[in-house]
Amino acid sequence: MGGLEPCSRLLLLPLLLAVGGLRPVQAQAQSDCSCSTVSPGVLAGIVMGDLVLTVLIALAVYFLGRLVHRGRGAAEAATRKQRITETESPYQELQGQRSDVYSDLNMQRPYYK
């Protein structure tokens, strides 16, 4: 099984469980338990049903997402840009390089040059 792709291995697992005739695993200490056991075929069916439902949900989301009108997003982006340009920035704009702010530090510690 080293050469199979992960998808092929995943599809092969329920087949091996159902055809292999594996008995449900029971703990020896709980042999007097009146619990119901789950056969490998039922377990494989649950796993396969879950995988099918997951794929169907993913496909439904994909196709419903494609149906959304794309022009609406462009109109929202234009109004958003307009709102951004109208809003005044609360930050002070940068000024040019000012060497006088840190000039006294160079005189105190010349070994950092």
From Swiss-Prot:
Transmembrane segments: 41-61
Signal peptide positions on this chain: 1-27
Gene Ontology molecular functions: metal ion binding; protein homodimerization activity; signaling receptor binding
Membrane topology label: Single-pass type I membrane protein
Biased amino acid composition, Polar residues: 87-100
Record topological domains on the Cytoplasmic side: 62-113
Post-translational modification comment from the UniProt entry: Following ligand binding by associated receptors, tyrosine phosphorylated in the ITAM domain which leads to activation of additional tyrosine kinases and subsequent cell activation.
InterPro entries found in the cross-reference section: Tyrobp
Keywords carried by this UniProt record: Calcium, Cell membrane, Disulfide bond, Immunity, Membrane, Metal-binding, Phosphoprotein, Signal, Transmembrane, Transmembrane helix
Protein's cellular compartments: Cell membrane
Origin superkingdom: Eukaryota
Function: Adapter protein which non-covalently associates with activating receptors found on the surface of a variety of immune cells to mediate signaling and cell activation following ligand binding by the receptors. TYROBP is tyrosine-phosphorylated in the ITAM domain following ligand binding by the associated receptors which leads to activation of additional tyrosine kinases and subsequent cell activation. Also has an inhibitory role in some cells. Non-covalently associates with activating receptors of the CD300 family to mediate cell activation.
Gene3D superfamilies in the cross-refs: YojJ-like (1.10.287.770)
Site (Important for interaction with transmembrane receptors): 54
Region (Disordered): 75-113
UniProt topological domain (Extracellular) ranges: 28-40
Positions of post-translational Phosphotyrosine modification: 91, 102
Record-listed Ca(2+) binding positions: 50
One of the GO biological process terms: negative regulation of B cell proliferation
Subunit structure: Homodimer; disulfide-linked. Homotrimer; disulfide-linked. Homotetramer; disulfide-linked. Homotrimers and homotetramers form when low levels of partner receptors are available and is competitive with assembly with interacting receptors. They may represent alternative oligomerization states or may be intermediates in the receptor assembly process. Binding of a metal cation aids in homooligomerization through coordination of the metal ion by the subunits of the oligomer. Interacts with TREM1. Interacts with TREM2. Interacts with CLECSF5. Interacts with CD300LB and CD300C2.
Keyword check for Metal-binding: yes
Residues covered by the ITAM domain: 80-108
Cellular component terms per the entry's GO annotation: cell surface; plasma membrane
Full protein name: TYRO protein tyrosine kinase-binding protein
Family, as annotated: Belongs to the TYROBP family.
